[in-house]
């Protein structure tokens, strides 16, 4: 009887040591070849975070949402799950592009993407070149129309998926 009790206790202890799978899906580094750009436009050229050829930022055509972030940015970490959820619903209707700024090492940005469920293209701006084109601070989210015109700039953290959906409908005319 003592052995049975000991076995039972061991089973309970082992059951308590199991982990549940993470709610965050695995992200992936996506190349930037799917982005629609106007090749005649000159401007701030950034490489893709995956190491592939990048784009000239001002040449981007939408409809697109551009989210400027950094792995070191607390509010960016806070809002990223909202972008992941939003993108799962909106990926067939618009382009989502991230720009990783002022990162100490490219590996930090790549790790951020891979561990937060991010599955859209991201550009890499290690030295703040986008500041002249986009302004300073993170997070910032831009809504870009089909002609490449920024129609709205949200400064600060996105607080809900509903906010993203509302801004997308209001400024890009796309219901998600």
Q: Which residue ranges define each predicted feature?
A:
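Short active-site neighborhood of thiol/selenol oxidoreductases, capturing the structured segment around
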Residues: 55-77, 83, 96
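Short loop/turn microsegments at loop-to-beta-strand junctions
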Residues: 42, 64, 138-139
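N-terminal targeting signals for export/organelle localization
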Residues: 1-47, 166, 174-176
């Amino acid at each position: 009887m003592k052995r049975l009790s000991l076995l039972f206790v061991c089973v309970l202890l082992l059951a308590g040591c199991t982990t549940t799978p993470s709610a965050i899906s695995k992200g992936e580094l996506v190349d930037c070849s799917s982005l629609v750009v106007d090749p005649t436009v000159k401007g701030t050229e950034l490489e893709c975070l995956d190491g592939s050829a990048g784009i000239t930022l001002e040449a981007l055509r939408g409809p697109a949402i551009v989210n400027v972030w950094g792995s070191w940015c607390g509010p960016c970490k806070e809002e990223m799950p909202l972008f992941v959820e939003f993108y799962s619903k909106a990926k067939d209707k618009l382009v989502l592009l991230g720009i990783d700024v002022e990162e100490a090492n490219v590996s930090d940005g790549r790790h951020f993407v891979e561990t937060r469920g991010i599955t859209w293209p991201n550009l890499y701006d290690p030295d703040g070149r986008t500041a002249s084109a986009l302004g300073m601070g993170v997070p910032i989210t831009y809504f870009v129309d089909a002609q490449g015109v920024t129609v709205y700039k949200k400064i600060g953290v996105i607080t809900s998926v509903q906010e993203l959906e509302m801004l997308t409908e209001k400024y890009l005319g796309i219901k998600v």
